[in-house]
Curated annotation (Swiss-Prot):
It holds the Pfam family Actin. Its main location: cytoplasm. In vertebrates 3 main groups of actin isoforms, alpha, beta and gamma have been identified. The alpha actins are found in muscle tissues and are a major constituent of the contractile apparatus. The beta and gamma actins coexist in most cell types as components of the cytoskeleton and as mediators of internal cell motility. This is Actin, cytoplasmic 1. It is found in: Cytoplasm, Cytoskeleton; Nucleus. One of its GO terms (cellular component) is plasma membrane. The modification N-acetylglutamate is found at residue 2. Polymerization of globular actin (G-actin) leads to a structural filament (F-actin) in the form of a two-stranded helix. Each actin can bind to 4 others. GO terms for molecular function: ATP binding; hydrolase activity. The lineage of its organism: Eukaryota, Metazoa, Chordata, Craniata, Vertebrata. Its EC number is 3.6.4.-. Keywords: Acetylation, ATP-binding, Cytoplasm, Cytoskeleton, Hydrolase, Methylation, Nucleotide-binding, Nucleus, Oxidation. It comes from Salmo salar.
Length: 375
């Protein structure tokens, strides 16, 4: 397919927006889902200061901006800002006219119905797209791994969910959702760094902590043992240089932060960890298909990028499951983008072409068409 008519695939995550053309093997544009507004009064006349900045530009000017994420826990909470992000995606990042391309959007499972209706409405009414579709993120990740059966543990910045899929069908009764993801881990790391005497408070400083988390954190195979190692030696300590040149040292925070995924009580949450949630999700499925799910547990999303997470999942699920069960955790190296890659695959399938919601269908039925056409 040529770029002229290629479908656009936009995976709007709570933390990062991934966008590009169907048929490509990676997104062309990846930028933070941030809208920033100046905190101060502009004094330089004629500088062309804007009243809002999106994505990387907001990130680079973060020192003078208040940064807002319009998507929280996978749900769009601020539609005006969301429109700015989409506008930025089409016109600045991809440099295309949305009225000339079908658009595939993604959403978290168990999202409010109104959320996808509004997405549909904005695409057709604000951007005049000829056709659009809303796909479930985890299903796309499974496509990207080349499977049609498996359970996907998808964890991004705003929401984590486990979605069992059998022969291409998501099993809605067994989908579980956990509102604990990357952003909560960033906040938790901010908190435990404060205990070490490093104070991070502003929205801009939170981005620094996110970078520390992405570069230095890992998942311990045995948490208690790792805590012992950290207490008795400095072998686990790493240093990080802040933008102002100050160097900070972090030790057990490196694995205490992502440990919250397995022990949400660290964050004061009552929910089960990601290993138990995955197990519970499998147990809600028919007894005949559990074996296939255990053997095809696929990790996806940026919050599954910690070193050691796959081994730890293997260990935890093995201890929960029947002893004879074969358990396989699949952690593709490109899992940060597997939702987008799955969308790219789906939108370029010839069989998918009749699945699009067309402008005409939208004009006839209104936004509710999305529930009938998109699973």
């Amino acid at each position: 397919m040529e770029d002229e008519i290629a479908a656009l695939v936009v995976d709007n995550g709570s933390g990062m927006c991934k966008a590009g053309f169907a048929g490509d093997d990676a997104p062309r544009a990846v930028f933070p889902s941030i809208v920033g507004r100046p905190r101060h009064q502009g004094v330089m006349v004629g500088m062309g200061q804007k009243d809002s900045y999106v994505g990387d530009e907001a990130q680079s000017k973060r020192g003078i901006l208040t940064l807002k994420y319009p998507i929280e826990h996978g749900i769009v909470t601020n539609w005006d800002d969301m429109e700015k992000i989409w506008h930025h995606t089409f016109y600045n990042e991809l440099r295309v006219a949305p009225e000339e391309h079908p658009v595939l959007l993604t959403e978290a499972p168990l999202n409010p119905k109104a959320n996808r209706e509004k997405m549909t409405q904005i695409m057709f009414e604000t951007f005049n797209t000829p056709a659009m579709y809303v796909a479930i993120q985890a299903v796309l990740s499974l496509y990207a791994s080349g499977r049609t059966t498996g359970i996907v543990m998808d964890s991004g910045d705003g929401v984590t969910h486990t979605v069992p899929i059998y022969e291409g069908y998501a099993l809605p009764h067994a989908i579980l959702r956990l509102d604990l993801a990357g952003r909560d881990l960033t906040d938790y790391l901010m908190k435990i760094l404060t205990e070490r005497g490093y104070s991070f408070t502003t929205t801009a400083e939170r981005e620094i902590v996110r970078d520390i988390k992405e570069k230095l954190c890992y998942v311990a195979l045995d948490f208690e043992q790792e805590m012992g190692t950290a207490a008795s030696s400095s072998s686990l300590e790493k240093s990080y240089e802040l933008p102002d040149g100050q160097v900070i040292t972090i030790g057990n925070e490196r694995f205490r932060c992502p440990e919250a995924l397995f022990q949400p009580s660290f964050l004061g949450m009552e929910s089960c960890g990601i290993h138990e949630t995955t197990y519970n999700s499998i147990m809600k499925c028919d007894v005949d298909i559990r074996k296939d799910l255990y053997a095809n547990t696929v990790l996806s999303g940026g919050t599954t990028m910690y070193p050691g997470i796959a081994d730890r999942m293997q260990k935890e699920i093995t201890s929960l499951a029947p002893s004879t069960m074969k358990i396989k955790i699949i952690a593709p190296p490109e899992r940060k983008y597997s939702v987008w890659i799955g969308g790219s695959i789906l939108a370029s399938l010839s069989t998918f072409q009749q699945m699009w919601i067309s402008k005409q269908e939208y004009d006839e039925s209104g936004p509710s068409i999305v529930h009938r056409k998109c699973f």
